[in-house]
């Protein structure tokens, strides 16, 4: 879990694909008489977001209505269109990466100053689209509900939360009571001092 983070082998594949898909995206929009400029590309762990700026006079709703056409033209499983991006003069179009890049716990932990004890209940949830560490303070949440379909990552999320707490607190600072009806998910934590 805290092994050294290997070099990202998927980055080159996703960077090359993003360049091709970005050019193709502008061409697809042009085919539907939408003139736009690609202004930025953000490659995240699972999706790539293209920020495009349509020419003056292009209705945002016209771009939204092209989701299925964009999906087919780019030959991707899904497309998400954020029109407009809040606070920006642009439209965001997200497509899945060819290769997903796993987010390692060591990457997240290394972003936090180990000497900073002001947020002992800070938990690591992953990375956002821009690759920034996503954290939240468990002590500031009145409630926390984790739900999802089978195989969607609920147990991975719980393990990330528990590991975050174990890495940042001492046994006299946090006590845990874990209830595991299946007697499978939390067995690795059976002998923790917390």
Can you annotate each of these PLM segments?
Residues 36, 85-90, 94, 113-194:
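P-loop NTPase catalytic phosphate-binding loop
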Residues 32-42, 77-84, 173-175:
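Short beta-strand elements
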Residues 21-24, 61-78, 161-162:
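Short, non-transmembrane amphipathic alpha-helical segments
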Residues 1-11, 45-56:
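Short, hydrophobic beta-strand segments
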Residues 11-19, 57-65, 146-155:
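Ordered, soluble secondary-structure elements with a strong preference for glycine-centered loop motifs
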Residues 56-58, 98-104:
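Short, charged/polar, Gly/Pro-enriched secondary-structure boundary elements
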Residues 67-101:
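Conserved glycine-bearing catalytic or ligand-binding loops at nucleotide- and phosphate-handling centers
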Residues 1-40, 97, 120:
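Charged, low-hydrophobicity low-complexity segments
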């Amino acid at each position: 879990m805290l092994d050294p983070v290997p070099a990202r082998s998927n980055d080159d594949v996703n960077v090359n694909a993003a360049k091709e898909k970005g050019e193709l995206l502008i061409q697809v929009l042009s085919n539907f008489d939408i003139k736009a400029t690609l202004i930025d590309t953000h490659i995240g762990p699972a999706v790539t977001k293209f920020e495009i700026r349509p020419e003056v006079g292009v209705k945002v709703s016209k771009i939204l209505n092209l989701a299925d056409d964009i999906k087919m033209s780019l030959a991707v499983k899904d497309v998400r269109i954020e029109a407009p991006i809040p606070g920006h003069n642009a439209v965001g179009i997200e497509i899945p990466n060819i290769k997903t890049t796993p987010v390692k716990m060591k990457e997240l932990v290394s972003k936090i100053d180990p000497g900073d004890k002001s947020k002992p209940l800070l938990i690591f949830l992953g990375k956002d689209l821009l690759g920034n560490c996503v954290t939240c303070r468990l002590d500031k949440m009145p409630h926390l509900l984790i739900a999802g379909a089978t195989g969607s990552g609920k147990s991975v999320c719980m393990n990330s939360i528990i590991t975050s707490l174990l890495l940042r607190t001492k046994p006299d600072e946090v006590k845990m009571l874990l209830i595991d009806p299946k007697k499978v998910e939390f067995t690795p934590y059976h002998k923790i001092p917390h």
